[in-house]
Design a protein with these regions (language model features):
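Short acidic/polar active-site loop segments enriched in Thr and Asp
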Residues: 83-84, 176, 195
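Zn-dependent metallopeptidase/amidohydrolase metal-coordination segment
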Residues: 183-217
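Flexible, glycine/charged-enriched surface loops at secondary-structure junctions
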Residues: 35-42, 146-153, 235-241
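His/Asp/Glu-rich mid-to-C-terminal helical/loop segments that flank catalytic regions of hydrolases
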Residues: 206-241
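Generic non-transmembrane alpha-helical segments
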Residues: 137-145, 188, 227-238
């Protein structure tokens, strides 16, 4: 059934959804990689499409920016549209010098400065982590595609312009990259007993100052998208065994 943020009908979304932040990137992914993509949502300009990839139904829908936004869209997909897996395909700022522009990282865990998990009333600190089966399928897909993919912790920040500039401290802890969505996705997946994974392509390096142009961010993340799509195919094949 439609929600205040999604006009799609039940059954319009595939079991696996790729979730970029930018609606224009969602459109690009659908039109570039999916066969017969159909627009199923455009509320607030947050575009959602469903098509097929190698004969497998796959959807792509934008999340917007930040944990509150992906928190809404991923929760509704999990609970109202029977989506089983959401793979975030976004951008991130590298916190390690050996990560180059365009490199792909997979968030095994998501450190955060957010209190998103406070809603669960836990008597401690919840550790948001990726679904192991999704992560394993992504690692296997990257190897098959010959794409380098670093796996480790991401740092999901509530603030883009952070006055305290904590990035170097997180880098000292071996965190690979900083972004703004993974922790909320992982929390929602855990709470709803579904699957979440965050793949990010490096758009800039916090330590070196290198960065991609806004235009390149939209279209240059082909390797990451192929890993995500091949992961979706593997998940369907696994479910049919």
């Amino acid at each position: 059934m439609p929600t205040p943020h999604n006009s799609a009908k039940k059954g319009d979304f595939a079991k696996t959804v790729l979730m970029p932040g930018d609606p224009l990137r969602a459109k690009f992914i659908a039109e570039t990689f999916l066969d017969e993509p159909k627009l199923v949502n455009n509320v607030r300009g947050v575009q959602g499409y469903t098509g097929t990839y190698k004969g497998v139904p796959v959807s792509v829908m934008a999340s917007g920016m930040g944990m509150p936004s992906i928190g809404i869209y991923s929760y509704e997909l999990f609970t109202q549209y029977d989506v089983e897996s959401i793979i975030r395909v976004g951008s991130a700022g590298a916190l390690q010098k050996d990560l180059k522009l365009g490199d792909v990282v997979a968030g095994m865990g998501a450190c955060t400065n957010s209190n998103y998990a406070a809603q669960y009333g836990l008597g401690g600190t919840f550790a948001p982590i990726a679904d192991f089966q999704l992560l394993s399928a992504a690692v296997e897909s990257a190897k098959e595609l010959g794409v380098r993919m670093d796996v480790g912790n991401l740092y999901s920040s509530d603030t883009f312009y952070d006055a305290s500039n904590p990035s170097l401290k997180w880098a000292d802890m071996g965190v690979l990259a900083i972004e703004m969505e993974a922790a909320a996705l992982y929390c929602n997946a855990a709470y709803t007993k579904k699957r979440g994974l965050s793949l990010c392509s490096i758009s800039d390096n916090i330590l070196t100052g290198e960065e991609l142009s806004p235009e390149a961010r939209q279209t240059s993340f082909t390797a990451m998208m192929k890993i995500a799509l091949e992961t979706a195919v593997k998940m369907v094949a696994e479910s049919q065994k």
